[in-house]
From Swiss-Prot:
Keywords: Magnesium, Metal-binding, Transferase. PANTHER family: GERANYLGERANYL PYROPHOSPHATE SYNTHASE, PYROPHOSPHATE SYNTHETASE ATMG, PUTATIVE (AFU_ORTHOLOGUE AFUA_8G02400)-RELATED. It comes from Aspergillus fumigatus (strain ATCC MYA-4609 / CBS 101355 / FGSC A1100 / Af293) (Neosartorya fumigata). This is Geranylgeranyl pyrophosphate synthase spyE. Isopentenyl diphosphate binds at residues 84, 87, 116, 133. Disruption phenotype: Accumulates dihydroxyfarnesyl-triacetate lactone, 17-methoxy-16-hydroxyfarnesyl-triacetate lactone and epoxyfarnesyl- triacetate lactone. The gene is spyE. Mg(2+) 1 binds at residues 123, 127.
Amino acid sequence: MVSIPATSLYGLGRQQPFQDLSKSLLTHLNLFTPQEAQSQAVPGTRTETEPTGSSPSDLQEQRKLADDKIIWAPLDYLCSFPGKDIRGKLISAFNQWLQIPEDKLDVIKRVVGLLHSASLLIDDIQDSSKLRRGFPVAHSIFGIAQTINSANFAYFWAQQELKKLGKPEAMVIFTEEMLRLHRGQGLDLYWRDSLTCPTEEEYLEMVANKTGGLFRLAIKLMQMESHNTEDCVPLVDLLGIIFQIRDDYQNLQSDLYAKNKGFGEDITEGKFSYPIIHSIRSDPSNFQLMNILKQKTEDEDVKRYAVRIIESTGSFDHCRKKLENLTAEAREILKDFGDLGNTDGLKGILDFLELKG
């Protein structure tokens, strides 16, 4: 008999790392119902009692289970200390008025949870990150090759989960948004690696594709299942941009962010984030910031000097003002949605995303 934890990624509190990772992926993503688990080798489960004798099919199943645990291990490790789960909260908030059936909602949450976690594994490799949520990145534990394979496996597992929605349109949405996400990521990487500073408009278009991709995927799948015909995509695109600009700001200004990811990680990565782009374009005659990005430095004194340059051009103030304007725009859209159902959850997310202080 297989022991299946009932909880999902959504609603879990922070767990201690270095727990028994053999349980974590199923616990967080709730990939199967108990009935399905009886007939499938589920990564991250264990038998409650060992049979006194094992048939060839039992042994084959046990071997497959052991293999799957190896394949899932990097993702298991990442999921053993969940983040803020903004995407899960966003899905729940939109469902207050989209009102899709619970079984469909669970599938969409699993799909987005898998895709998001897999994308973090890949991002950390592409960005040469050291920390994720305050702990060593997965590829520092399992190696780059195994981590890439685990992430790719999760992408296709998410695709397989879509079949449970029973609609061909779901696959069209999935493919379209994954292509947009990777287009956005490709431009972000190109700008960094070629030391090409984009315009703010180019950056925001990239963000709409990249950061907004999983937001949009989730909401489009929900709209597909909902009787509510209001188009939520413009609001979702706006939320994706707000989320990214806020993240860019926090990367260079937040002590908590520094604790979880390292101080000024975007500078070490050489990334053209929103405040960095504004600073460079505000003073094209000053090449210091561009040269610091080129070095991909880990020297904290140099990074703090870069932050002072960004501050001197008013770029952090510009970020705060941009976020205020975008948040006000999102609240105006919510007013139009108010007559269609409960929007308290979405208002709560906007409150959370507002910079404090």
